[in-house]
């Protein structure tokens, strides 16, 4: 029940889209589809489909899905373990013919693609009716992301049904909103599989919401359009039904919500960390609910009224780490949606959670120790705040650079860059589209560069991002500086790499800058520069990472 966990997949891809336990052999056969399907611009790709027949002791990579990138769903026929369906959502930034629904009749040895829409529309969910396994439902979602924009929805998004094991398919849209559709989350009631629920992203805001069918999808009726149901459908697209009661529905979202009257009204689930992405009922005791959130795994023993955190599973995600020269040295890092921290690399009896010190909130990214003083720099997403933290006093001071009157609005990357100086310890750098420099640990700032990005107006309209559901979190901010490095051998040499493909360098402390990206052989235009490391051996040398 979550009391203990053991890792069984660490040697393989760590980005997971779907886990399916074979209903006929749950102790041994597990399928894993890789690639995260909550399509933020920073999610990792998968490398295909895996299967174990010994409960996770060993895994076989299944041929045919190497280019799938994101597998949204795996479904096993409960009456025939060799019959398996796989829904491939597919590539995030490009066209892909690997999208669609696939089927095997021999346990994964051979596959047939049984439903395909086009290169831009992938399968976002699948369901096999356990009472009639030839009945299969599949939702398809048309979407496309670029580094600076996201578009959810189109004419090809749809919910399909097959009653002959995938030989033929039909859209089941009677009662759906007119016009373009986006992501469709759906589920069937285990106690009565004729009852279906779907949360639909639609062209009109008034049409978005929860729909119900009582005849296997032949007809649909809208029930509810509460904010928590429709918020960020590309990111929160999971709905589950109580296995005993078709009128109890839970929906993932910012806080998670539950209905006990068939979807007419919803209440917030018990307190959890925000951003709930997955929820499941215990099939033997539906009062027990598990939730996967940005803050970890939670469980409920009382049908969602209260939720408790499962604190024995390490699932935090570090964006970036740094270290100091203490003995033992300390490790500094920012966590996805869980703040910024530092802690010792070793401790008598082992490092414990209580040894770690929080130095920031929100999405942390870079956390840097002052080179000579016991101070720590940290930030949150989009440079909404930048801090200088004094651990001895347990005090933090806000120090982020601000736009000067008359200057253009500052564009900060979601993971904005900061850097310290090995030559002048109190010097601190921060990046927007400009390089900002402070000589007094962030008390005052000066710009030492012009706009070092391409400043492409097409790529700086994040207010229009989202498609059918406007989404302007700041994560798509583009034409920004992503990495800064001062030479440890010459304080006048400073490097800056941008997310839109520039490498700029100054040799005179910021008076003049030169874009040297053309000197990188074989680099495609506009390739993001993710990191620059100035050499400790040659003052004109640097190492760069691109993606």
Give residue spans per PLM region.
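Beta-propeller blade termini and top-face loops
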Residues: 1-547
């Amino acid at each position: 029940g979550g009391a203990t966990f053991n890792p069984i997949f660490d040697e393989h891809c760590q980005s997971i889209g779907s886990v399916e336990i074979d209903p006929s052999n749950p102790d041994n056969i597990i399928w894993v589809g890789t690639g995260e399907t909550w399509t933020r611009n920073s999610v990792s790709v998968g490398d295909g489909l895996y299967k174990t027949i010994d409960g996770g002791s060993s895994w076989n990579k299944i041929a045919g899905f190497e280019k799938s990138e994101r597998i949204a769903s795996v479904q096993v026929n409960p009456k025939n373990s060799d019959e398996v369906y796989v829904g491939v959502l597919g590539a995030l930034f490009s066209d892909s013919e690997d999208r669609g629904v696939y089927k095997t009749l021999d346990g994964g040895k051979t596959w047939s693609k049984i439903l395909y829409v086009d290169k831009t529309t992938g399968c976002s969910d699948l369901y096999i009716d356990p009472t009639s396994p030839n009945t299969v439902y599949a939702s398809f979602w048309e979407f496309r992301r670029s580094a600076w924009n996201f578009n959810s929805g189109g004419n090809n998004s749809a919910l399909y049904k097959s009653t002959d094991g995938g030989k033929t398919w039909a859209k089941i849209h009677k009662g759906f909103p007119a016009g373009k559709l986006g992501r469709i989350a759906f589920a069937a009631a285990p106690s009565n599989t004729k009852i279906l629920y779907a949360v639909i992203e639609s062209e009109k805001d008034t049409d978005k919401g929860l729909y119900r069918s009582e005849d296997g999808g032949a007809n649909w009726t809208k029930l509810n359009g509460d904010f928590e149901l429709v918020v960020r459908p590309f990111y929160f697209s999971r709905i589950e039904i109580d296995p005993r009661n078709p009128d109890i529905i839970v929906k993932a979202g910012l806080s998670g919500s539950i209905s006990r009257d068939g979807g007419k009204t919803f209440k917030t689930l018990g307190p959890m960390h925000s951003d709930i992405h997955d929820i499941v009922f215990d099939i033997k005791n539906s009062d027990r609910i598990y939730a996967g959130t940005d803050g970890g795994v939670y469980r409920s023993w009382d049908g969602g009224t209260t939720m408790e955190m499962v604190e024995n599973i390490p699932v935090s995600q570090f964006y970036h780490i740094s270290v100091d020269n203490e003995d033992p040295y300390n490790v500094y890092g920012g966590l996805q949606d869980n703040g910024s921290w530092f802690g010792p690399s070793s401790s008598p009896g082992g490092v414990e959670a209580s040894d770690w010190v929080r130095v920031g909130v929100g999405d942390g990214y870079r956390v840097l120790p002052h080179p000579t003083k016991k101070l720590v720099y940290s930030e949150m997403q989009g440079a909404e705040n930048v801090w200088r933290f004094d651990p001895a006093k347990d005090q933090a001071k806000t120090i982020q650079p601000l736009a000067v009157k008359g200057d253009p609005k500052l564009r900060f990357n979601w993971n904005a860059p900061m850097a310290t100086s090995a030559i002048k310890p109190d010097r601190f750098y921060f990046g927007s589209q400009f390089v900002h420099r402070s000589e007094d640990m962030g008390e005052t700032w000066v710009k030492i560069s012009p706009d070092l990005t391409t400043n492409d107006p097409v790529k700086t309209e994040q207010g229009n991002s989202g498609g059918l559901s406007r989404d302007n979190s700041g994560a798509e901010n583009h034409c920004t500086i992503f990495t800064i490095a001062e030479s440890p051998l010459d304080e006048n040499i400073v490097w800056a790499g941008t997310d839109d493909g520039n490498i700029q360098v100054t040799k005179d402390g910021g008076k003049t800058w030169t874009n040297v990206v053309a000197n990188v052989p074989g680099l495609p235009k506009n390739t993001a520069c993710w990191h620059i490391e100035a050499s400790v051996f040659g003052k004109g040398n640097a190492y760069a990472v691109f993606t």
